Design a protein with these regions (language model features):
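Short S/T/G/P-rich N-terminal loop/turn motif that feeds into the first structured element of a domain
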Residues: 1-49, 59-67, 80-105
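Conserved RNP beta-strands of RNA recognition motif
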Residues: 52-56
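A common structural junction motif
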Residues: 72-77
């Protein structure tokens, strides 16, 4: 399992409310991405950066997603190149679902 942290700078013209509304509008579309597991949409408390913490089944599925139309949309909407950092996910603990489990290789 792969966790990807994606960050991009927000233009000053995009307000917190606009960012929130946009995230809510696009969230369902991620469910169709091959290899996608979960995304947490994130917004810096100072309003300067936004992005996501994604979970993917494989590194290949993550890289394929970020090199497709998604990247063009980010560049067009925010006017900058996102930073993407990939991590191997060794374990997950989730209070909401009451689970904690290791990721098997």
């Amino acid at each position: 399992m792969i966790t990807a942290i994606v960050l991009y700078e927000l233009p000053q013209s995009i307000t917190r409310q606009q960012c929130l509304a946009h995230f809510h509008r696009i969230a369902p579309g991620f469910l169709e991405a091959p290899g996608f597991i979960r995304k947490q949409f994130i917004y810096a408390v100072d309003g300067k950066v936004a992005g996501g913490a994604y979970m993917w089944k494989t590194l290949e599925s993550a890289k394929a997603f970020y090199s497709g139309p998604w990247l063009d949309c980010i560049r067009e909407r925010y006017g900058n190149q996102p930073t993407i950092t990939y991590f191997e996910t060794f374990a997950v603990a989730d209070q909401k679902d009451g689970v904690s489990y290791p990721i098997r290789e």
